[in-house]
UniProtKB/Swiss-Prot annotation:
<comment type="similarity">
    <text>Belongs to the bacterial ribosomal protein bL28 family.</text>
</comment>
<dbReference type="InterPro" id="IPR026569">
    <property type="entry name" value="Ribosomal_bL28"/>
</dbReference>
<dbReference type="InterPro" id="IPR001383">
    <property type="entry name" value="Ribosomal_bL28_bact-type"/>
</dbReference>
<keyword id="KW-0687">Ribonucleoprotein</keyword>
<dbReference type="GO" id="GO:0005840">
    <property type="term" value="C:ribosome"/>
</dbReference>
<keyword id="KW-0689">Ribosomal protein</keyword>
<dbReference type="InterPro" id="IPR050096">
    <property type="entry name" value="Bacterial_rp_bL28"/>
</dbReference>
<comment type="subunit">
    <text>Part of the 50S ribosomal subunit.</text>
</comment>
<protein>
    <recommendedName>
        <fullName>Large ribosomal subunit protein bL28</fullName>
    </recommendedName>
</protein>
<dbReference type="InterPro" id="IPR037147">
    <property type="entry name" value="Ribosomal_bL28_sf"/>
</dbReference>
<dbReference type="GO" id="GO:0003735">
    <property type="term" value="F:structural constituent of ribosome"/>
</dbReference>
<dbReference type="GO" id="GO:1990904">
    <property type="term" value="C:ribonucleoprotein complex"/>
</dbReference>
<dbReference type="InterPro" id="IPR034704">
    <property type="entry name" value="Ribosomal_bL28/bL31-like_sf"/>
</dbReference>
<dbReference type="Pfam" id="PF00830">
    <property type="entry name" value="Ribosomal_L28"/>
</dbReference>
<dbReference type="GO" id="GO:0006412">
    <property type="term" value="P:translation"/>
</dbReference>
Length: 81
């Protein structure tokens, strides 16, 4: 099972981690210089939860946003257990 929200489709993002040195121009410096860029993974806020869909019980990954939606009541035939 991939780490992707069953309801919203949210998943991990690959982003750049930018390392800088120096003092900003606004603070009286000559500006910030980029000294390194590396890729990193920004993880989605996912939780493994049991749901009931069409009478069947499934264990799926759900985002925090989807959990808030489901806590208000059934949504598209899906409910939390």
């Amino acid at each position: 099972m991939s780490r992707e929200c069953y309801l919203t489709g949210k998943k991990n993002l690959v982003v750049n981690s930018v390392i800088r040195r120096g003092k900003a121009r606004a603070d009286g410096g000559v500006g910030r210089k980029t000294t390194g860029i590396t890729k990193r993974v920004q993880r989605a806020n996912l939780h493994k939860k049991a749901i009931r869909e069409n009478g069947q019980v499934k264990t799926v990954w759900l985002s925090a946003n989807a959990l808030r939606t489901l806590s208000k009541g059934p949504y598209k035939g899906i409910e939390l257990i």
